[in-house]
């Protein structure tokens, strides 16, 4: 076996690997391009070549250097990004290329259990994942959903909500402003930069590999769902809504419309993505659509035994700054700018 380091955004070896392997959207060159365009990180991947020179395994990663120190993440701001390996020997061959960097390494696994058996990595967090098989007929998908979901969808339809595809960056901006407010006022969190969503729009929506569904009440945008597409899977990536219009139940209707869009495109799975375990309401919400549930494992290699005192202090400061900038008295444009400056540190 031979191993090479490549740029996963444009190298043909990486493209061939993700085409033939059980890859997800977070392995895709487009997603990695979104990350590097937004944050300026260097993205790389190690690829193992078989005796014929064909790619047979690989792992993408970003090396990040900032006020928190140096670290390797596979991959930042991705729900999960399993190493594309089928055996323990290939996993060790890949990760042994990164260990000599002598900095923390973070990997998020959903489908691949091989890294969990590596004693050099420790489990530091778990999250929930939900997915829905789109292959059954629409009537069967409807029947599998909870009665409360049926009622919510019918209510939104009775009240005249209309769902359509976003057509412009002006509508993308309207979605982002809802997203910013949900993050700030509901969760006390900063939002990713608007440029992140612009890059998703450019690399996915304009490339016909994703879409933004909007729910409108009397011509007013009241909610939106951002979906990405990769291979045979539709990814439910972002949701936002106006609190004052939640009584119309737009979010259930949006997902039902997303399911139907996925079926029309011939897709086989709707990936509902990551939910933190303490987000009990979100977990219950995703279960109501008849989803399968699995666990995402967050693994970390700590060559120095854990965070340095400086890193701990900086992360505490980051938490305090988040609280300050998401205070309800802070103007939303200031909160947005804080996300532009600080969100890159949440890796």
Kindly give the residue locations of the regions a language model identified:
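Aromatic (often tryptophan-rich) hydrophobic motifs at membrane interfaces
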Residues: 47-50, 55-58, 67, 78, ...
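A short glycine/small-residue-enriched secondary-structure motif
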Residues: 62-80
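A gly/proline- and charged-residue-enriched helix-loop-helix capping module
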Residues: 74-114
């Amino acid at each position: 076996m031979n191993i090479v380091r490549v740029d996963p955004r444009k190298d043909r070896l990486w493209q061939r690997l993700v085409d033939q392997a059980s890859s997800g959207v977070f392995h895709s060159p487009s997603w990695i391009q979104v990350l590097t365009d937004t944050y300026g990180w260097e993205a790389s991947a190690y690829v193992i070549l078989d005796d014929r020179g064909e790619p047979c395994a690989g792992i993408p990663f970003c090396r990040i250097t900032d006020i928190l120190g140096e670290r390797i993440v596979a991959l930042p701001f991705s729900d999960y990004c399993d190493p594309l390996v089928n055996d323990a020997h290939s996993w060790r061959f890949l990760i042994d290329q990164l260990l000599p960097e002598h900095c923390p390494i973070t990997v998020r696994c959903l489908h691949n259990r091989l890294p969990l058996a590596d004693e050099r990595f420790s489990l530091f967090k778990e999250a929930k994942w939900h997915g829905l098989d789109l292959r059954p007929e629409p009537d069967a998908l409807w029947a599998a959903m909870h009665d409360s979901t049926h009622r919510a969808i019918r209510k939104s339809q009775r009240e005249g909500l209309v769902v359509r595809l976003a057509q412009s960056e002006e509508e993308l901006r309207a979605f982002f402003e809802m997203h910013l407010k949900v993050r700030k006022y509901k969760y006390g969190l900063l939002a990713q930069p608007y440029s992140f969503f612009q890059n998703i729009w450019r690399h996915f929506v304009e490339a016909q590999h994703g879409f933004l569904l909007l729910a409108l009440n009397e011509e007013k945008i009241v909610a939106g769902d951002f979906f990405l597409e990769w291979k045979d899977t539709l990814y439910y990536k972002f949701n936002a809504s106006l609190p004052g219009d939640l009584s119309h139940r737009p979010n259930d209707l949006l997902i039902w419309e997303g399911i139907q869009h996925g079926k029309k495109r011939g897709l086989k799975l709707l990936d509902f993505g990551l939910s933190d375990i303490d987000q009990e309401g979100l977990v219950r919400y995703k279960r109501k659509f008849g989803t399968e549930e699995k666990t995402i494992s967050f693994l970390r290699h700590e060559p120095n035994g854990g965070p340095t005192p400086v890193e701990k202090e900086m992360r505490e400061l980051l938490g305090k700054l988040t609280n300050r900038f998401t205070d309800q008295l802070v103007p939303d444009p200031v909160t947005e700018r804080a996300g532009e400056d600080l969100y890159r540190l949440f890796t």
